Amino acid sequence: IDVASATGLPAVQDSLDPLHADSYGTGVLIADAETRGATSIVLGLGGTASIDAGMGILTALGAAAHDSRGYALPKGGAPLVQLDHIDTAQLNIKAGMLDFTLLADTRATPVQAATMYGPQKGAKGEQVALLAGAMLQACEVTGTDADSAYYGAAGGLPIGLSWLSHTLWGSDEHVRVLSGGTHVAAALGLPEKIASADLVITGEGRFDEQSLTGKAVGTITDLARQAGTPVGIIAGSFEHDTDAYCAPLSQEGSLAQQLAAAAGDIVKQL
């Protein structure tokens, strides 16, 4: 299941609501998959509009987030600052007991789901701080280590599913949180291809601090370094240091011409 297709930024780009967006749609797809016979699910994380610690998924599966007075919390990440416990009286046990593999697109921690990715989901100033506090509270209630890498992916979605596994199975053995970049690279045979290459060229629109936290470009440059293969990065702009060969696009001519010129610049640096 591609989480971005159900809970993604593209569908709501013109009406971002970082405080109240949720992952409910992904939960609906999980429940539907179980009724169709699925026993394990792979979730491709990334590109979500929500920062809700996966509570939307839990809600779709019948759980309910409650405050200390026993009242159900409104949807979204912001209300989680009042999270006291999660009610499981109506939980869809069959769907909850599926095996989950979560392919994360970032090594971000739960708090970084808000501080690093909140702004691109529309969060500003105090909203970022509020969502960061909400992630900490969700970690506290679910027993999640707030410093866990990858648990900030997709708005903290691994937090809720790991809690689900602990609740139903007594451990998180039925939820695997993996580096999506590393997983896909292995499936494509990239480690072997990069090791036998003379040069690797990769890139993205903007190279910044997020690029090296589990994104494709960071995964590829890591593999190249491990193999001792020279690596060059082409990007529209560079806002973070790297020891790779770099070539920003010139913004002159067609895109094809810019890419060709940038590739030439990398070759000249070798």
Locations of the language-model features?
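N-terminal loops that bind phosphate or other acidic moieties
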Residues: 1-45, 49-270
